């Protein structure tokens, strides 16, 4: 997949540590097209000390890791976004007076993909009070939920999944969301997703429902919070929404820590 923040973060980190970095863009690479993942892994593993992969299927990054012979970092797949979790955990720790195992956060929106899955597992592994607020049809898979509960038994984490957005955010210190339509999905799903998720928009009212005047808003970005992008303008013209998963008022408010997070 294409990338802005993930690519820049890895390249800056590598250079800060004195390492070199090569970027293979999707349109210029033969990975999976003329050369198998297995063969690509064995070639790149002989040239590089580590590989970061950002793409669609989790099985691809796992196959790279199996055959490369060097560390492989998951920069994002459809299922997980572990490097974003490092940033999210650090950001919550920086913006809270409590340790993470005494911190509550909620994720509201479509929770079936990488951010919903990863935040649920993150919270469970760190012993946090983690809530998912979404229609049941958009909850993480049964396997992900089971893994979260298994981790919670070891850490003392509290896991809540609810269809009530206000219930999900009550008492939390942080409210997370993400885009409602993921990269690669067709435009035709927008109407269905808006109908399902209109009550899970992060608005000033939802922030206030936390009952916490210090509650913070988080989003891994990019966000559709106004009409200043081609997609944002298309959404406004087609559906009449100025801002989708989060309103401009929340995104630009003092409660928003998305740029620290990014």
From Swiss-Prot:
InterPro entries, per the entry: Asp/Orn_carbamoyltranf_P-bd, Asp/Orn_carbamoylTrfase, Asp/Orn_carbamoylTrfase_sf, Asp_carbamoyltransf_Asp/Orn-bd, Orn/put_carbamltrans
The keyword Cytoplasm is annotated on this UniProt entry: yes
Residues the entry annotates as binding carbamoyl phosphate: 3-7, 30, 54, 81-84, 219-222, 247
Reaction(s) the record says it catalyses: carbamoyl phosphate + L-ornithine = L-citrulline + phosphate + H(+)
Effect of residue 61 to I: In strain: CCUG 24846
Domain of life: Bacteria
Keywords: Amino-acid biosynthesis, Arginine biosynthesis, Cytoplasm, Transferase
Biological processes annotated in GO: arginine biosynthetic process via ornithine; citrulline biosynthetic process; L-arginine biosynthetic process
Protein name: Ornithine carbamoyltransferase
Gene this protein is translated from: argF
């Amino acid at each position: 997949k294409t990338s802005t923040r993930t690519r820049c973060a890895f390249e800056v980190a590598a250079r800060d540590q004195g390492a070199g970095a090569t970027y293979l863009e999707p349109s210029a690479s033969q990975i999976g097209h003329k050369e198998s993942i297995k063969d690509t892994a064995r070639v790149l593993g002989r040239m590089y000390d580590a590989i970061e992969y950002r793409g669609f299927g989790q099985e691809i990054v796992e196959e790279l890791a199996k055959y490369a012979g060097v560390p492989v970092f998951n920069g994002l797949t459809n299922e997980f976004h572990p490097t974003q979790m490092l940033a999210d955990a650090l950001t919550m720790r920086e913006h809270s007076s409590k340790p993470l195992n005494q911190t509550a956060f909620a994720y509201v929106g479509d929770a079936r993909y990488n951010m919903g899955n990863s935040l649920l597992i993150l919270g469970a592994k760190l012993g946090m009070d983690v809530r998912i607020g979404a229609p049941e049809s958009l909850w993480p898979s049964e396997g992900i939920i089971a893994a979260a509960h298994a981790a919670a038994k070891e850490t003392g984490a509290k896991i809540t999944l609810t269809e009530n957005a206000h219930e999900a955010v009550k008492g939390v210190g942080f409210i997370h969301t993400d885009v409602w339509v993921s990269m690669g999905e067709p435009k035709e799903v927008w109407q269905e997703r808006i109908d399902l998720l209109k009550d899970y928009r992060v608005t000033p009212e939802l922030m206030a429902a936390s009952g916490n005047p210090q509650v913070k808003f988080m989003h891994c970005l990019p966000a559709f919070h106004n009409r200043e992008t081609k997609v944002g303008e298309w959404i406004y013209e087609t559906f009449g929404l100025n801002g989708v998963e989060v309103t401009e008022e929340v995104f630009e408010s003092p409660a928003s820590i998305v740029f620290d997070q990014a």
